[in-house]
Structure formats: C-alpha cells, structure tokens
Swiss-Prot record:
It is found in: Cytoplasm. This is Ribosome-binding factor A. Residues 128-139 have a biased composition (Acidic residues). Residues 120-139 are annotated as: Disordered. One of several proteins that assist in the late maturation steps of the functional core of the 30S ribosomal subunit. Associates with free 30S ribosomal subunits (but not with 30S subunits that are part of 70S ribosomes or polysomes). Required for efficient processing of 16S rRNA. May interact with the 5'-terminal helix region of 16S rRNA. HAMAP family: RbfA. Monomer. Binds 30S ribosomal subunits, but not 50S ribosomal subunits or 70S ribosomes. Its main location: cytoplasm. Keywords: Cytoplasm, Ribosome biogenesis. Belongs to the RbfA family. One of its GO terms (cellular component) is cytosol.
C-alpha cells in the first residue's frame, strides 16, 4: 500500500498528464464535441485504479458523445500514462462525468431566487430594530 502522500502525488500527476492528453493526444472527434476538463482524480491505495472525473461543457448530446469517446480512449490513455509516468504498474483508468459544477450552479440559482423572492418589509423591520438598539446603548 502506498502512503496518502504518494497517492495524492500520483493523482495530481495523472490529472496533469490526462489534461495534456485531452488537449493534444486524443484524436477521437467525439471528445472534441464538448469542452472537457479534468476536475479530479481518485487513485486507489494500491495505485491500481484511477477514477478520472471530467467536467464537460456543452449540450446533453455533446456530453453523451464525449463520454463515449473518452470510454473508447481508455486504452490509449492508459498506455500513454504508462509511457509518461514511471510507476511499477499503470493504473486502470475509468472516466466519470463530474456534475458538481452543474449542481453548484443550481444551488446558487435557487439561493438567488429565494433572496429575490424575499419581501423587502422583512429587511426594513430588521434595519429598524437595529437603529433602536443602537440608540439605547448611546444613552
């Protein structure tokens, strides 16, 4: 078993190398239909498996096509990792779509909507109470 420090260093190295491959190495047209970025890499403790989380910007169809292209390119990505990274064994690569950015945007939109729907009277009542409290302290 590798130490946590080594696992995190290998994960960062894989993230950097796969990002470079997405820019220059993968020639599959399906991968280019959506803008792809590597958001995170989880490497198992024995360094045998790497889950690569990707964020894809584009339509739902482009996301499906891009994921299909990435899944078909896993063999290429693994062999390139073996050539670029010095490890005893090259980890198995699994691409997973990261939807955390979409979920974050939805949460921000909901919070903005709640803030917008709040009646202004509540805000004025709070402000009036603070002014009265301030006067009582100055006496």
């Amino acid at each position: 078993m590798a130490t946590n420090r080594r696992v995190s260093r290998v994960a960062e190295l894989i993230k950097r190398e796969v990002s470079q491959m997405l820019l220059n190495g993968i020639k599959d047209d399906r991968v280019g239909t959506g803008m792809v970025s590597v958001t995170d890499v989880d490497v198992s403790g024995d360094l045998q498996h790497a889950k690569i989380y990707v964020s894809i910007y584009g339509t739902d169809e482009a996301k499906v096509e891009t994921m299909a292209g990435l899944k078909s390119a896993t063999g290429y990505v693994r062999s390139e990792l073996g050539a670029r990274v010095r490890l005893r064994r090259t980890p198995e690569v699994i691409f997973l779509e990261d939807r955390s950015i979409e979920r974050g945007n939805k949460v921000l939109a909901l919070l903005s909507q709640l803030n917008h729907d709040r009646p202004p009277e509540n805000l004025l009542a709070v402000e009036d109470n603070t002014d009265e409290d301030d006067e009582s302290f100055s006496e």
